[in-house]
């Protein structure tokens, strides 16, 4: 997993249903290539295979609930995420929380088969617990700010600062990214200045009238923070 990174979660928005998901992913891919930055997209499970097989940028699943394939009606197996071409997995989003035991098993399975693993957490202490599971990144997202347009980097910077401090101290190999209310390039820039290595966002990009233009704005700050090759 490369950093700094912009991860665009398409959730189950109507604006990202079917071929619309691919249109957003293509716009993200274009921006990633033009700016030379890392952008990943996380389509809904219905569009995961389509998007993963159509773009070169990383494509992440929004979640999973079983480790391996089998007789699990309406479930999502970690191994099948890899099989359809996705390269990563987001776990424990506040809209899809997991019990600790299940989260631990899913994260371990995903890492064992080579998937990037991002675990979401609502606060610094929970982020530290998530980091103990060995993901590539922890995304700290105060749930009360998600979808509000009130960026965590501006309204709760102390949450980011403390998360970065705790995780860096105890699990230096785990990267901290952040999300919740991120709407503008300025919000992204602020998050990076607070010590994160990227952002996880959704509505700002998905609901934009011009996906390319908005993603370009959101990704531009990554060029300043980009790590040398």
Swiss-Prot record:
Stored SUPFAM superfamilies: Triosephosphate isomerase (TIM)
EC numbers on record: 5.3.1.1
Alphabetically sorted, this entry's keywords are: Cytoplasm, Gluconeogenesis, Glycolysis, Isomerase
Respond yes or no to whether keyword Ubl conjugation is given for this record.
no
List the GO terms this entry assigns under cellular component, sorted alphabetically.
cytosol
Its biological purpose: Involved in the gluconeogenesis. Catalyzes stereospecifically the conversion of dihydroxyacetone phosphate (DHAP) to D-glyceraldehyde-3-phosphate (G3P).
Q: Family assignment?
A: Belongs to the triosephosphate isomerase family.
Q: What is this protein called?
A: Triosephosphate isomerase
Q: Give the source species.
A: Pyrobaculum islandicum (strain DSM 4184 / JCM 9189 / GEO3)
Taxonomic lineage per UniProt?
Archaea, Thermoproteota, Thermoprotei, Thermoproteales, Thermoproteaceae
What gene is this protein translated from? Answer: tpiA
């Amino acid at each position: 997993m490369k950093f700094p990174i912009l991860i665009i979660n398409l959730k189950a928005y109507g604006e990202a249903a079917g071929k619309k998901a691919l249109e957003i992913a293509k716009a993200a891919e274009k921006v990633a290539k033009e700016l030379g930055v890392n952008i990943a997209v996380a389509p809904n499970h219905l569009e995961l295979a389509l998007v993963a097989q159509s773009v070169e940028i990383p494509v992440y699943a929004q979640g999973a609930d079983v480790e391996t394939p089998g007789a699990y009606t309406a479930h999502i197996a970690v191994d099948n995420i890899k099989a359809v071409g996705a390269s990563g997995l987001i776990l424990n989003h506040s809209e899809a929380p997991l019990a600790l035991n299940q989260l631990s098993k899913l994260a371990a399975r995903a890492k064992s088969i080579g998937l990037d693993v991002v675990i979401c957490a609502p606060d610094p202490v929970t982020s530290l617990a998530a980091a103990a599971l060995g993901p590539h990144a922890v995304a700290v997202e105060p749930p009360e700010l998600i979808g509000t347009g009130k960026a965590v980097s501006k309204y709760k910077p102390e949450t980011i600062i403390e998360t970065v401090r705790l995780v860096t101290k105890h699990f230096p190999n785990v990267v901290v990214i952040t999300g919740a209310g991120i709407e503008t390039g300025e919000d992204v820039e602020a998050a990076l200045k607070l010590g994160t290595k990227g952002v996880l966002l959704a509505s700002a990009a998905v609901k934009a009238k011009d996906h390319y233009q908005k993603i370009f704005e959101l990704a531009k700050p990554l060029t300043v923070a980009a790590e040398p090759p």
